[in-house]
């Protein structure tokens, strides 16, 4: 089998797995659940189902001569932000539209699946076309994760996943600070599989010596910041962050409440006590930065984060993942296919630690870095309006979360969000100058 044929076979396999997983995430929902938008930052489940199918139509329109979109009405509703295809529907009004109906969206989903499958099975696809379909698959994986965020906000423990596995055994690990030697580091994706344009090209960066924590910051550590009055002291906060927490009355991470003197949270496991040994989750960049200042530390740059995650000092090589080049599985990290629906305690994945000894750099929580999101030197866009239009007012996060599909994460993967967003599964780890 030729390399191109192998890639096409892998493409079809990933496509089938991804479409199946999307349906599995919504299989237990009631029809009424599909249309609700509980906040302006989330989207109704039916919109996610339709949008990932519409993006497949976008790809097919770029690869099939004289392609006609299924419906102008559908395109207008399902277009997120692609002005080249018309005026996008307002995000904060996605829950106000009763048409297309839920049944129509499901019919559309299956029709587009069949149409794309026919192309993937029967057409001769050049490398550029295959990369576009890989992009569409990875785009759907991104929306699977966004859907998981939204399902937690919508339903919490009333969501009944098809599969729920037991969390790993509790750990008694304590975080330590690991020294990383500086020097030149080749940053970016170095593999031969799909990656996004923003992970390329590989390029040299210079790093000074630094320290980085072996674990993400835990709930126990973050509680001390909260209880020490961290949210009430302006000296820890960026100006915009200080305005944000006062205007929104933020006093804790999202979902935390103090009831009868006990810190509680509400998530897929229900209303429960905050587990002190889990990574803190649902914090914004502002909160992560403020904590680091309070602790006398700082957030790592994304280059520092990537080197700590992927550089093998002993063998002088870079690996795709912290543990090596093997694809992720539940032994290495807590990702979507682990189906735990929650963060694991720190130290739960010794087989997934980096060559330097940093744990849980893949999975559990996305980790904020101090780096502004922009293109690497000599960046070339791979798909207009997909990533490069966001090169302003965003910070880079690394590592994935328990909602991230395993095929869409690696040590070089760059996520990005605005500094005030925190409904995602976001945490952080601290770094220090030496």
Q: Which residues does each predicted region cover?
A:
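Polar low-complexity intrinsically disordered regions
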Residues: 1-6, 118-121, 165-169, 247
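Disulfide-stabilized, aromatic/cysteine-rich ligand-recognition loop
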Residues: 2-43, 47-54, 58-115, 119, ...
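Functional-site microenvironments in short loops/helix caps that host divalent-cation chemistry
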Residues: 132, 136, 140-142, 146, ...
